[in-house]
């Protein structure tokens, strides 16, 4: 029997790709441009992420000494975490990007007043990656306008469905 055909291979049980989403970022910022970055993690953090214990809601990225760091993102340690290693769930983590990407992000943050916001954390080939976005903060009236627009889209869909049922 030939085992080289794809239908003969056992199905791989992969974990879901998305680990965490930052839904607040879409509500509070205008997201302009997205970039993929790696994360410098410790072993206990990877285990905690596999268990689904990551939260990006309060996280943001900042520039220090020509490098970009993630601050405020929470990775809650597992109960079984080692006792001799002090696990700080909100520690500052280095973001891994190419030098050219870092330089362009630094330039846009410093010159144009953008903020770097984490929008998603996901798996890519057994590595944890983070999507960071260049963002501008929304004013209160922008948030209200976006909410009204969403409500109108929902109402429009309801009206169209009701009209199509009656036709």
From Swiss-Prot:
GO biological process: trans-translation
Presence of keyword RNA-binding: yes
Disordered, as annotated region: 139-167
Pfam families, alphabetized: SmpB (PF01668)
Source superkingdom: Bacteria
UniProt-listed CDD domains: SmpB (cd09294)
Subcellular location: Cytoplasm
Cellular component annotations (GO), alphabetically ordered: cytosol
MF-aspect GO terms: RNA binding
Gene3D superfamilies per the UniProt record, alphabetical: 2.40.280.10
Composition bias, Basic and acidic residues: 144-158
Key words of the record: Cytoplasm, RNA-binding
Function statement: Required for rescue of stalled ribosomes mediated by trans-translation. Binds to transfer-messenger RNA (tmRNA), required for stable association of tmRNA with ribosomes. tmRNA and SmpB together mimic tRNA shape, replacing the anticodon stem-loop with SmpB. tmRNA is encoded by the ssrA gene; the 2 termini fold to resemble tRNA(Ala) and it encodes a 'tag peptide', a short internal open reading frame. During trans-translation Ala-aminoacylated tmRNA acts like a tRNA, entering the A-site of stalled ribosomes, displacing the stalled mRNA.
Family stated for the protein in its record: Belongs to the SmpB family.
PANTHER family the UniProt entry points to: SSRA-BINDING PROTEIN (PTHR30308:SF2), TMRNA-BINDING COMPONENT OF TRANS-TRANSLATION TAGGING COMPLEX (PTHR30308)
Alphabetical list of HAMAP family matching this protein: SmpB
Name of the protein in its database record: SsrA-binding protein
């Amino acid at each position: 029997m030939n085992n080289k055909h794809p239908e003969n291979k056992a199905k791989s049980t992969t974990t879901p790709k998305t680990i965490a989403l930052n839904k607040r970022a879409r509500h509070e910022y205008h997201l302009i441009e997205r970039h993929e970055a790696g994360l410098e993690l410790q072993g206990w953090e990877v285990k905690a992420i596999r268990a689904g214990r990551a939260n990006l809601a309060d996280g943001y990225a900042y520039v220090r000494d020509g490098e970009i760091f993630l601050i405020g993102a929470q990775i809650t340690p597992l109960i079984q975490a080692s006792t001799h290693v002090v696990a700080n769930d909100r520690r500052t983590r280095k973001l891994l990007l190419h030098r050219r990407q870092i330089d362009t992000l630094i330039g846009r943050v410093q010159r144009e007043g953008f903020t770097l916001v984490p929008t998603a954390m996901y798996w890519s080939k057994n590595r944890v990656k983070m999507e960071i976005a260049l963002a501008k903060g929304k004013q209160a009236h922008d948030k209200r306008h976006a909410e009204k627009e969403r409500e109108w889209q929902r109402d429009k869909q309801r009206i169209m469905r009701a009209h199509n049922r009656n036709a």
